[in-house]
Every structure is written in structure tokens, then in C-alpha cells.
Amino acid sequence: ETGDNLMKEDWKPGTMIYPLPAVLVSCGSTPEEYNILTVAWTGTICTNPPMCYISVRPERHSYDIIKRNMEFVINLTTKDMARATDWCGVRSGKNYNKFEEMKLTPGKSTVVSAPLIEESPLCIECRVKEIVALGSHDMFIADVVNVRADTSHLNTETGKLELAESNLLVYVHGGYYGLGEKIGKFGWSVEKKK
């Protein structure tokens, strides 16, 4: 329905900001400790200095690993990684080696000791600055200390990263989705017509 007939109803307060990136967070300082955690409660919180966050339940296996090492890697996921992304969110690293089970490759990060995931098109190395207890989740506020990009997604002419072609995965209210078509670019609504 449109116009005056458009109906809305009140719902109880809840977490309804969607879509969100569905990322794999890798952590651990030694191969024996390496683990992967699926996270949708993540995002950018500052441009300069570059900072981001992940929110994790204290009972999750990765929580103690991240708290102990104070670093992690946010690995963006793709359509090809969808099964691994879901699986790593419903299985515990206490019982499984998630890298082996999902045939993901732990790679060497440049700055942090936590591994990156080689299959990810973009890996964001993070160092925890502050942990904020919020309720069901604690927020790990982190400085971005390095970004590693898969060169296959670099435009050789412009040098720009073209992540849209990598079939990024997003999370919407319990479901995983690919990105749709491009609608515009930042600032297009105010550009002067040539």
C-alpha cells in the first residue's frame, strides 16, 4: 500500500539494523590456538584513526582467545565462503579445528599474530583498544593496524579495490545474501549533469 494507507506497527526494541557484513573473525597467536568466529555485529566506528568493532558473547570460545591476545582479524566473506561462514557460527572451536573442517587456509598476518584467512578477499588486522561490557555481548573496540587485499580484486588501471565483483556476503535477520546491483556511487545524487 502507498501514501496514506502505508501502515506501520510498533515492535519491541530489537536489533533490526540490516544488512550487516557476515564476517569471519580469526584469532589466536599459535596454530594450536587458532580459531574462527562468525560475526555480524561488526562495523567501522572511526575513519581517522581507522577503528572498528566486533561484539562477542563472553561464553564464545573465541572470546577468551581475543581477550588474552588483544588482537584479531576481520575477514570479509564471499558467496563461495557462505557454508563456512554459517558453519563457523554454529560450531565451537572447543570441539573443532575450524580451519581444517572448512578447508580454510590460515595465512600470516603482517602486523598481528592472529592468522588471516587466505580465501577472504579482504583481511583487516585489528588490535583491541578497549572492551566494553554491554549486556549479552562485549564490544571489542579496535584500531585497524593493517589491511591485506587480494590483488585479484584490484583494478590494474585505477589501482582501486573492486570488492563488489567478489560476491560479498551479507547477513539479514537470520539469512545470508549476496549483494544486489549497484545503484549509484557516493555523491551521485548531487553531481552536476555534464
Model regions: which residues?
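Basic, polyanion-binding surface patches
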Residues: 2-194
